[in-house]
Regions:
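Predominantly a Rossmann-like dinucleotide-binding segment in NAD(P)-dependent oxidoreductases
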Residues: 5, 16, 118-211, 265, ...
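Beta-loop-alpha module in the N-terminal Rossmann-like domain of NAD(P)-dependent dehydrogenases
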Residues: 43-103, 310
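Hydrophobic residues in well-ordered beta-strands that form the structural core
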Residues: 86, 92, 111-113, 257
Length: 357
């Protein structure tokens, strides 16, 4: 049981049939951080009534709805004096995301976004190894996020609601794959390397029958410091499940992290043996206090997605409680990802030209 005062929260969306709603609830319960005291789980319910009746009675609101309502719900909650953790993307447009960032700052509210992979212990180790110069100067990054989820759908039948809204521009916005999972990869690149993506050249495609939005993207990136990146993201990668694979190449060493084997991190050197770091091994604390702090169970017992999600919530709830900065993705990261989404869309529309992020 968490000895700190338990928080109270409400949730919009994430009801029956939702994938992400139960993930939020399980993640919060993992550390006994907060109690769910109210909710609005169906489109037939009015989230405005929820915000009105919860004003001054909850510590934060979790927004787990489709993309189209992220902005208006988050804005209303911030204006009502609530802290908010909103599902990605933060909004449907860069202008909306920027407005929410400014509103949160003006209202002195905590605004978080669950870019889950930054909550994984070995991602923190990767970030800290880069920070301490283990890889040297970063020259190249390769990020792959491959899912085959759209290959499992029978498009001759009505789509289930979990997939249907992601292909509907009115609910998903102008992008499917880049805004849905591409933002995770973008955030992972910037989080681990400490570099900013400055430009993008994007080639977006729609292969799934009837999909009006992108379900596959091949992109080149230019990063601060002169580094370059290759970034591919897909929902039509046949046979793949959730293949997030990150490679970072420096002039001294390189690293490799695979989400499907996320308890390990590989570092390679030109004139020395490869090192395989294991999550929560005895030496980890000396290399990365953050990685050690995020590990929950002994090495050899695998942790994964829900634990990573719970780590985001643990940091977010700490910020809600003590009103100090903590290590979780916030409004700034939400704005950065929307800058990237819009730049990728412009590049694709303008003949695959380089666009500023």
């Amino acid at each position: 049981m968490n000895k700190e005062k338990r928080l109270k929260y409400a949730m919009v969306g994430g009801g029956k049939g939702s994938f992400i709603g139960p993930i939020h609830r399980m993640a919060i319960r993992m550390d006994d951080l907060a109690d769910l005291v109210d909710g609005c789980y169906s489109h037939t319910d009015d989230w405005r009534d929820l915000i009105a009746r919860c004003r001054g009675k909850i510590d934060f609101l979790a927004v787990c709805t489709p993309n189209s309502s992220h902005y208006e719900i988050t804005k209303a909650a911030l204006e009502a004096g609530m802290d908010v953790l909103c599902e990605k993307p933060l909004s449907m447009t860069l202008d909306e995301a920027t407005e929410l960032e400014r509103l949160a700052r003006r209202k002195r509210r905590v605004l978080g976004i669950p870019f889950t992979y930054s909550g994984f212990p070995m991602v923190k180790l990767a970030r800290d190894l880069v920070k301490r110069g283990e890889l040297g100067k970063i020259d190249k990054v390769v990020l792959e996020y491959s899912q085959g989820s759209f290959r499992k759908i029978d498009f001759s039948k009505p789509l289930d609601k979990r997939n249907a809204w992601k292909m509907d521009p009115k609910k998903a916005g102008p992008s499917c794959v880049v805004a849905d999972i591409g933002v995770h990869g973008f955030h992972l690149i910037e989080h681990v390397t400490g570099l900013e993506v400055r430009q993008v050249l994007a080639d977006l495609s729609s292969f799934a029958p009837g999909n009006r939005l992108d379900d596959d993207a091949s992109m080149l990136l230019r990063l601060s410091g002169g580094a370059k990146a290759m970034f591919t993201v897909s929902k039509v990668a046949t046979g793949e499940e959730n293949g997030v694979r990150l490679r970072v190449y420096g002039d001294k060493a390189s690293l490799y992290w695979n989400q499907e084997e996320n308890n390990y991190l590989s570092v390679k050197y030109p004139f020395a043996p490869e090192r395989i770091y294991k999550r929560n091994a005895p030496y980890i604390g000396d290399l990365s206090a953050a990685s050690k702090a995020l590990s929950r169970i002994p090495a050899g017992h695998h942790e994964g997605f829900i634990e990573g999600f719970a780590n985001i919530y643990r940091e977010f709830c700490a910020a809600v409680r003590d009103r100090k900065p903590h290590d979780f993705p916030g409004a700034h990261e939400g704005v950065r990802t929307m800058r990237f989404v819009e730049a990728a869309l412009r590049s694709n529309k303008n003949g695959n030209r380089w666009e500023k992020v």
